[in-house]
UniProtKB/Swiss-Prot annotation:
GO biological process, one term: base-excision repair, AP site formation via deaminated base removal
Coiled-coil region: none
Lineage per the UniProt record: Bacteria, Bacillati, Bacillota, Bacilli, Lactobacillales
One Gene Ontology term of the molecular function aspect: uracil DNA N-glycosylase activity
Subcellular location: Cytoplasm
Family of the protein in this entry: Belongs to the uracil-DNA glycosylase (UDG) superfamily. UNG family.
HAMAP family from the UniProt entry: UDG
Protein name: Uracil-DNA glycosylase
Organism of derivation: Streptococcus uberis (strain ATCC BAA-854 / 0140J)
Record keywords: Cytoplasm, DNA damage, DNA repair, Hydrolase
Length: 217
């Protein structure tokens, strides 16, 4: 990410020592035990979806905390790994909305301009949200604010109460916010199923003369 537009813009909006503090934090936690994703994949969302290509932002909370799952993209796992419950429900809603997708790896979405961002970018094994509130939120809030500052229209997909709190950062009237309950089994039946975020997103992109996302790719 170091030479990307994201890095340059984020650096401008955070304190001068912030990236040094991130590196200190990472040195510490990765030396203490198993942390996900692999260190080289922490910023994968930003490297796979350059600022210039951003069309959609899907916000997650923190990485999957089981072995082999997290790959630096919110909600995504490698195809060789069983889909976690939230991803199962995302694919179920996609199937009802647009069509069936067999892949669990969402990298192809990222390459089309879908920023798959977690608010917290690291997690210790089997300890969900353990790194929340420690270092990452100023960084990922800056990413959301930079997405909001884009001149071209962006679709923000916010699932669940945690993500919806970030709506306060989305003030540009050019953008579209799609919000619903979280795809987790605990809440999917309270407004996620039937919300049709994928077709709504593509309709908005087409209205704005932007290439729609091939969600089935």
């Amino acid at each position: 990410m170091e030479h990307s537009t994201w890095h340059r813009k984020i650096k401008e909006s955070l304190p001068p020592d912030y990236f040094a503090r991130i590196n200190q934090f990472l040195d510490q936690v990765y030396s203490q035990g198993r942390v996900y994703p692999k260190r080289e994949h922490i910023f994968k969302a930003l490297t796979e979806t350059p600022y210039e290509d951003l069309k959609v932002l899907i916000l997650g909370q923190d990485p999957y905390h089981g072995p082999g799952q997290a790959q630096g993209l919110s909600f995504s796992v490698p195809d060789s790994i069983a889909a976690p419950p939230s991803l199962q429900n995302i694919l179920k809603e996609l199937s009802e909305d647009i069509g069936k997708r067999d892949h669990h790896d969402l990298t192809s979405w990222a390459k089309q301009g879908v920023l798959l961002l977690n608010a917290c970018l690291t997690v210790p094994e089997h300890q969900a949200n353990a790194h929340a509130g420690l270092i990452w939120e100023p960084f990922t809030d800056a990413v959301i604010q930079l997405a909001n500052a884009k001149e071209s229209p962006v679709v923000f997909i916010l699932w669940g109460g945690f993500a919806r709190k970030k709506k306060a950062f989305i003030t540009n009237p050019k953008h579209l916010v799609i919000e619903s309950a979280h795809p987790s089994p605990l809440s999917a039946y309270r407004g996620f199923f039937g919300s049709r975020p994928f077709s709504k997103c593509n309709a908005f992109l087409k209205e704005n003369q932007l290439e729609p996302i091939d969600w089935l790719q």
